[in-house]
Amino acid sequence: MAKYAGIDISYCQPDVDYSALKSGKILGYPVKFVMVRAAYGTSMDKYFLQHVRGCLAAGLYVGVYLFSTAKNAAQAKAEAEWLISTIKANKLDGKITYPIAYDLEMESQYKLGKAVCTAMCKAFMDTIAAYN
């Protein structure tokens, strides 16, 4: 079974050499996929489109993630709807071949409790699943 590596990129990596990334290795494994940060809440990452298009042009598989700022399930669903709209508006339908992920890691969100965080994740993922 072949083994591959992947990375995540965002505004924190403004200058990416996508071709070098494609030919690079992580822990000896070739880089095959990249998870690109789409947004912080519903504010698009300023390098989202550049990163997605650069990775696709280099022949890398692309997934995206949304760094959530939601405080409840309705806001999480709105984040998912925003992401779907953004993907469609930028003609990325069918080009995102790796998962769409939900990044829930703000300390203030942990304080909401397990039930609320679970409901937020479910609302986001159910909305994404209906799109896919």
Describe each PLM feature range.
Residues 2-125, 129-131:
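Substrate-binding cleft of extracellular glycoside hydrolase catalytic domains
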